[in-house]
Amino acid sequence: MFKRNAINWLEKWKIKNNRKPLVIRGARQVGKTSLVKEFAKQFDDFLYFNLEIADDLVLFSKEVSIDTLYEMMLAVRRKTKSIGTTLIFIDEIQNSSLAIKMLRYFYEEMPHLYVIAAGSLLETMLNKDVSFPVGRVEYMALRPCTFDEFLGAMGEDASTYISPTAGFATG
């Protein structure tokens, strides 16, 4: 994984006092999942759920309390509550309107947890009877890599391509 500038934004989100769950939007294959998995290395515990996988989606098949949902998440991943930092990542969240709804309760009742959700088709959910937790989540749009990110992935930087005398006639 090459360094994405968005990591810096995630690090600022992590230290916010009144941090809300984060919803990362973006087209398919722009690196949402890879970005969050790289960011997850900064946490003591990481719980990853991909709602394209039936065993993960079943967690959101019935409405339960946020405490019960968190206990179920821990049990499914064979983890216990941590005194350290825990990042919960719900990938492909557009597959469950209940998962979207539960983001509100992570914010209101479990603010000590770091929660990120990602999806590529979230705009299509607006046409359905889905209640997005307005004011209780933050959004971030992830785009394809920038030129600087591309150069970094190639082991180069922009100074290789930009001459301090570019644009000036000589002789």
Give the residues covered by each predicted segment.
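Structural recognition of the conserved hydrophobic beta-strand(s) that form the central parallel beta-sheet
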Residues: F89, Y114-S120, A141, F150
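Short glycine-rich substrate-engagement loop in P-loop NTPases that contacts/grips substrate
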Residues: L51-G84
